Design a protein with these regions (language model features):
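Short Lys/Arg-rich basic patches
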Residues: 1-20, 27
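Short, hydrophobic/π-rich interface segment
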Residues: 118-171
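A generic structural motif
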Residues: 170-180
């Protein structure tokens, strides 16, 4: 009996001179290992950021949520003009909005612990930072917002948990108080 083999399809892409020179420069400078890994990365970003829904240029969506590319300084200026005692509440509201977006767009229920790996991956893809679970702790490495109070509220609203900050500088560590 013959075993069914997975066929590999070869594809030829005709690039403009400028496009090819750009790709070659990425490879030459060590920013990309080769054309195949670059294309694979681009497709991964295309899928994970739902670029097929974008109305390029200038109107970007990820499911039901409109996405805007803003620099972190913009976010920091906004936060600096909001009283510190409101940061947890603002974070919580943002987390609740992110929860609705993930559920409606990705069919991921963020308040179920079995989905947290997928939730953390989504946050990482969108540039929020690197999120990890360690026992009853959530760790955020390289957060794009440097105010732990905002993250405390955000994660509480998103994940439906009660947290206590264990560090006030990045990497942030939050203990889950209602951990079961």
């Amino acid at each position: 009996m013959m075993e069914k083999r997975k066929t590999v399809k070869r594809t030829t892409i005709v690039l403009d001179k400028e496009e090819r020179e750009y790709i070659d420069s990425l490879i030459r400078e060590g920013k990309e290992p080769g054309i195949k890994p670059l294309i694979s990365k681009m497709l991964d970003v295309y899928r994970s950021m739902m670029i097929y829904d974008w109305r390029f240029p200038g109107e970007y969506y990820c499911g039901i949520s409109r996405i805007a590319f803003v620099n972190v300084e913009f976010i920091n200026i906004l936060l600096e003009n909001i009283p510190r005692e409101k940061w947890v509440e603002i974070g919580r509201k943002a987390g609740e909005a992110a929860k609705v977006s993930m559920e409606a767009s990705l069919n991921v229920e963020a308040d179920k612990r079995e989905n947290w790996d997928e939730v953390f991956k989504r946050l990482r893809v969108q540039g929020f930072g690197d999120f990890y679970m360690r026992d009853k702790y959530i760790i955020i490495k390289a957060p794009f917002i440097d105010k732990y109070e905002v993250w405390e509220g955000f994660l509480e609203g998103l994940l439906g948990v009660e947290l206590e900050a264990r560090s006030s500088t990045a990497p942030f560590v939050f203990e889950i108080l209602n951990f079961e």
